[in-house]
């Protein structure tokens, strides 16, 4: 026995444990949390020129982003995320904003200050102001908050005041902020809350550069006005197309619930790996812990924003990371059952499993990349974490896991301890009794997966036809992401009723289309509205529910234009992911396997859609994330099966359909344990997310759970069986010739 390798193993494990204990918490604490985890505000603006005929250029968009960044600083947001999208859109994300009504006003106000006479003729505008010359102060007589500004030219102001003075009795100098064509002083002055800021009477000529703006402000309003004027006017007009706001209490609760769900799920996975795979399972637990740390650390280095779906992706990634370990460990167990030594089985198992793991991960990454390209901001967070998880898990599960296990294997300490790999001694053959065609014992070697394929084809076809009928009758319960409108989520510390929530909205003059209760104690009310309420109405809603229930409601609005775009992008995403997978599988395997795989993937996706239709669960953008995740995961399962088929095809070279049938059946028998164990680990995670996770990812978790179970069926009884029937027909034609 080589004690040096044993000592090296324990030193490495000690080093890893110490490093994880010391560095994991700081890495996790440094990560920037998204809106859905700490509360905040997100809005997608459509950018239009102030003057008709002007064009929105790249320079104009950049200038607008700079102006919005300055305004975000006024709000005290240290790290605003402001991005240009397309040719005429800007997305603004402000995490941690406490007063979202104020944020809305400060962001969208153009801050075009103008001085006009009572007939609305412009006399002065923002160009006449000294840069950064506005400040909030108090009137020396009334002690009311006011804003003082500095003008560039005292003589020009003198001429303006002289002209207005002569217009008595209409000698008002009207100060406007964001005057629009059609606005009228004479109409506004009759209103309780006029649009103009102030309208002082001018009784003498004023040759000065110091001007006071009085408007019955609060101190905060005066301060905001001064800050907006100093930040500079927006060079464009901004129109909200999509918005979502999350109350801080919602975010904190979502973070707590989802992290707790993750801890429970990961702990169960660790116990399963230790129980089923024993020593290799312990290695998997160590490498999975390293995977979690590295993923969080890289996410921090990227300055990426961690969203609720991102945490779900990290937790889901643990379940998927286990897959690489399971594939390798099952291969090692097969080699041990053939009577090989521990060292020989370890080397052979690692060599044979590498291509399978590589192909399975690449196909999942294809789906994740497409998701990143076509997803909304929160879905991009999910896709980023999923891609990062796949790449990191490949490194930890393939290289670190093998390195640590190799230290033990090469020490010769395990030479007589095959049982430590989870192998039953009675299933280990004498190597003298085996040859290249000998197959190891599997728990499912008596199962015939292919003899009833026609019945499964009929069953799958019947389910598809039934699904089409269900969709035609029930259709989908589209969320506002696709149907447009508004969604307002109210949280209370006590049980709510639909009647109570409806009355709350009625008191605000709003008529919700539907009201649904959620949460363990029915303390969350979700109201849907067909139209998109204006900013003033949203402000009233936030104030009302904050005062009544003590927490800000979550408000999301989607315009019809954006709703259609999201629906279109969802279809593009599924189509492009499918095409990408077909191309890759065709290159690595053959086009028949690619087509068979896509048929099973589309069946999975269609089954989930049908399930959501009949259960009336809401379909939103996270639903699309779930669909693409299942596509990536299900192809992973199918790839493992086809990789084993390819291996047997090279070795056995079938000449008849019976030979081909035997190969497919044998491949399914040998990979079924891996399929069950992998699905089980991912299902554990999904179920814990479903039970303990935040309510906002409940439908996402349900879609994943349904897809995972359907994916096992489709991999066994659709993908493999279609390829068998297709390849068998080709084989018969070749033999006939």
From Swiss-Prot:
Induction: Shows maximal expression at the beginning of post-exponential growth phase and increased expression by glucose in the post-exponential growth phase when cells are cultured on rich medium. Expressed constitutively during growth in minimal medium. GO terms for molecular function: protein-transporting ATPase activity. It is a multi-pass membrane protein. GO terms for cellular component: plasma membrane. GO terms for biological process: intracellular protein transmembrane transport; protein targeting; protein transport; protein transport by the Sec complex. Residues 446-737 are annotated as: SecF. The chain crosses the membrane at residues 6-26, 255-275, 279-299, 302-322, 354-374, 381-401, 454-474, 570-590, 594-614, 622-642, 678-698, 700-720. Keywords: Cell membrane, Membrane, Protein transport, Translocation, Transmembrane, Transmembrane helix, Transport. InterPro entries: SecD (IPR005791), SecD/SecF_arch_bac (IPR022813), SecD/SecF_bac (IPR022645), SecD/SecF_CS (IPR022646), SecD_1st (IPR048631), SecD_SecF_C (IPR048634), SecD_SecF_C_bact (IPR055344), SecDF_P1_head (IPR054384). Residues 27-254, 300-301, 375-380, 475-569, 615-621, 699 are extracellular. It is found in: Cell membrane. Residues 1-5, 276-278, 323-353, 402-453, 591-593, 643-677, 721-737 are cytoplasmic. Disruption phenotype: Cells lacking this gene show a cold-sensitive phenotype and a filamentous morphology. Residues 1-416 are annotated as: SecD. In the N-terminal section; belongs to the SecD/SecF family. SecD subfamily. In the C-terminal section; belongs to the SecD/SecF family. SecF subfamily. PANTHER family: PROTEIN TRANSLOCASE SUBUNIT SECD (PTHR30081:SF1), PROTEIN-EXPORT MEMBRANE PROTEIN SEC (PTHR30081). Required for efficient translocation of secretory pre-proteins under conditions of hypersecretion but is not required for the release of mature proteins from the membrane. Part of the Sec protein translocase complex. Interacts with the SecYEG preprotein conducting channel. SecDF uses the proton motive force (PMF) to complete protein translocation after the ATP-dependent function of SecA. Part of the essential Sec protein translocation apparatus which comprises SecA, SecYEG and auxiliary protein SecDF. Other proteins may also be involved. This is Protein translocase subunit SecDF. The lineage of its organism: Bacteria, Bacillati, Bacillota, Bacilli, Bacillales.
